[in-house]
């Protein structure tokens, strides 16, 4: 793709184009999304609704169907990989990839870890078999005991018995990464809380050294709201260059803000996060630049709902003469959110994917509650979604 074509596409790129953003939604689906975000736009309604859903589930009242057609239907692909096929196909029609995200938060025991491992292996096979699924993804806490991950990065370390359990989980990790390597499937390892992240990083880089010599298979996630993360990214790039492997990077702002601040306050240590959102935004955008500057060595994905960061990346790609569909660069958003970004980027020829959570309704509820609460607490995010849906409803009325 030429520099000229890139410039032309950038000029026509608009995150305000709701006709493109919601083209795949019928009038009924559009109105349903409109009402979901109308409710989520009211913080007190989110809290009230969450309380009653938890209560009804606890009392085993028949609310599964209501949940499945509302919150679950908005943010999840289905209860199984098979149920996600319709979503995968719909996204693919718009040239948007799917990242199947098994979002079940199971118990911390070996039986649960094995079930999760087996499900992750299924998503890797599914990705290998379908060009519509460019990545697989998982969390370390799906296969590791979180207390062991935390203890591993302390001075005390693990006991002999704990070491056995830890190594068993590490075997699951190696099995997952080996399968991704064998199937040539790119694999995101999601970031988690700072008190277990050092362990996750260590394991992740060990897997990169093992599997990323031909191309980026293993991707680590960098949460740019952490004060040390930009430096960590630069260091990771340097190590990858020094040891001759490809660095897989997923850039995010960060998902555990309130949890991190609460723990820092309770345990009386300095918060590892930026005090101001502007500093997070700055580091996120500098992280994009660092990846672009080392594009031969780095494959990266920007996981963001921030329009400015997406536009900046598009602008920098144009300035450097990098084609929209460069295989080392991806954009990603969550299913059911920021369709104005995803669909308009895809329409302009950029590589885009949606995170598509799936799993049994009752098991995915903790994820959905967090999503609803996070949306209502992120300044402007829900009202932005609501305003765009409102705009498209009005546009269709006037046709």
Give each language-model segment a name.
Residues 2-399:
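Positively charged, amphipathic and often flexible ligand-engagement surfaces
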